[in-house]
A protein has these predicted regions:
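OB-fold and OB-like single-stranded nucleic-acid-recognition modules
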Residues: 2-8, 21-197
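Bacterial N-terminal signal peptides
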Residues: 12-20
């Protein structure tokens, strides 16, 4: 009987050993270090947009058309790279999306011309106008969208914030280059270059 018990224990031990060896070895990977194990880097939209910024500005500036000529001609029907100069009539802070209202030199139309200056910016004008990268440059829509948002943050940090815009800009001359989007009553520009004198 003791021999049978020992044999039974030996068989159970062997079965247990076989069962556990089928599980393999599990490696616990610390959070944030996945790339060192998989070789796949996590997408960093902030770093990507910051690294691309100067090239994006040059790209859009090269494509920019005179806004007055466009508006006095056939108008704007899609997002367009533009440049222009005008007098600041108003600094609107009534909504979280602050903007300058600009009277363009030579513009004969009735649409209000706005240059974004602050607040949340959901525009995709900069992302859509630059030709460094396109949707296929990214893994998915989330990365493409995130890249666009980070380009807007670069515009705010690199172009708008250094100007410290306040009510004192009213009456001054603004020169801009950026992406224009036309609505029913207004043309709104997200600037990649902006000077106020």
């Amino acid at each position: 009987m003791i021999m049978k018990s020992r044999r039974l224990l030996a068989v159970l031990a062997a079965c247990t050993a076989v069962t556990f060896t089928g599980c393999g070895v599990v490696t616990v990977v610390p959070i944030g270090e996945e790339a060192s194990y998989t070789g796949k880097q996590e997408f960093d939209s902030a770093a990507e947009s910051e690294g691309d910024w100067s090239s994006v500005v040059a790209d859009i500036s090269q494509k920019a058309q005179d806004l007055v000529e466009l508006l006095n001609g056939d108008g704007i029907t899609e997002t367009t790279a533009v440049k222009g100069t005008g007098k600041i009539k108003e600094y609107n802070t009534d909504t979280p999306k602050h903007y300058l209202v600009v009277e363009l030199d030579g513009f004969t139309g009735t649409k209000e011309i706005r240059v974004r200056t602050d607040g949340p910016n959901s525009s995709t004008a900069i992302r859509d106008l630059q030709s460094l990268k396109n949707f296929e440059s990214f893994t998915n829509q989330t990365e493409w969208s995130s890249y666009g948002k980070e380009l807007n943050k670069q515009a705010l940090a690199q172009v708008i914030d250094p100007l410290e815009i306040d009510e004192s800009v009213v009456g001054k001359t603004v020169t801009f280059t950026g992406g224009a989007e036309a609505g029913a009553d207004a043309v709104t520009i997200t600037a990649v270059e902006l000077t106020i004198e």
